[in-house]
A protein has these predicted regions:
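Short linear loop/turn motifs
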Residues: 50-54, 84-86
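Short, structured motif recognition centered on aromatic/hydrophobic residues
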Residues: 11-20, 30, 47-51
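Winged helix-turn-helix DNA-binding recognition segment
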Residues: 42-46
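Substrate/cofactor-recognition hotspot
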Residues: 13, 53, 58-61
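Acidic, glycine/proline-rich low-complexity segments that act as flexible tails and inter-domain linkers
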Residues: 1-11, 22-24, 28-31, 35, ...
């Protein structure tokens, strides 16, 4: 809990998200951490920037694996986004 960690709620939520990225957690695991981050007043951009912050430590492959999971937790329709990219590639 944030009270036990000594961190403010926003920092605590970002640490939780960073940990989920590091351990390659399943998509449902991101839901409560993202909810806590948003409840703490963090923006979606700040939450996504966690991917960039942890990349030097966890590696690109782990961040690439985590990005769609984090996107789903933020409410993005990740499969639709991939379909748009695929159709754009077909049109070229």
């Amino acid at each position: 809990s944030p009270a036990l960690s000594g961190l403010d709620p926003g920092a605590h939520a970002l640490v939780r998200i960073a940990t989920l990225i590091a351990v390659d957690a399943a998509p449902p695991s991101y839901m409560s951490a993202v909810s806590a981050a948003l409840d703490a007043g963090l923006s979606m951009e700040q939450i996504v920037e966690t991917l960039i912050a942890v990349m030097p430590t966890v590696g690109v492959a782990r961040v690439v694996s985590a990005a769609p999971k984090l996107g789903l937790a933020l409410g993005y329709d990740v499969s639709e986004a991939f379909e748009v990219v695929a159709s754009d590639d077909l049109e070229r």
